Amino acid sequence: MHQIAAQWPAKAMAQIFITGNTEIDALHYTVRNDFHHPEIEWAKGSRLIAVTAHKRENLGEPMRDMFRAIRRIVEEFTDVKVIYPVHLNPQVRKIADEEFGGCERIHLIEPLDVVEFHNLMKASYLIMTDSGGIQEEAPALGKPVLVMRDTTERPEGVEAGTLNLAGARMEDIYRECRRLLTEPEKTNICPAEMAGNSPGRRKKVDS
């Protein structure tokens, strides 16, 4: 017997049970309507972009390209603010400080705990990331995701239109982010199911 968290790997396999995704289930407990955080308060009235970027393969020029695209967006759209909980990796911090320094509408903050970050995503207009798990969590909150990578392990999100695969080059990231900001219908998405409700989801998938 095989157990999986989503539908798409099951298409050509027998004896598979969908068990749900506990990562998504956690959102029911962490996201709160009465949550308050000073950074989220700072961003009220703006279109908030939450950023995560730390993948080792992006260190160096690829990461600088990402950050330059983000800064270009902030400089162009005066109603956009960015909150970036910076990874503890010294290389990431150095690049972030160099590329974002002096930009008042980009806040570099310390890493958040899971409750804080889930509520940051909920308060955001969109999320820009090179991370994997966020590609599942953000769509479950109804938030579009701009994936700053060339590939993704979540192709079902791309097919559903909740993930926007931009690559890691500055012009591509800038162009895709600008599209999401200037075409509001691209960000008005319904929360994706993303296989939550683990206790109630154990069912056999027919091949």
Label every model-predicted segment.
Residues 1-84, 89-207:
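Nucleotide-activated sugar donor-binding and catalytic core shared by glycosyltransferases
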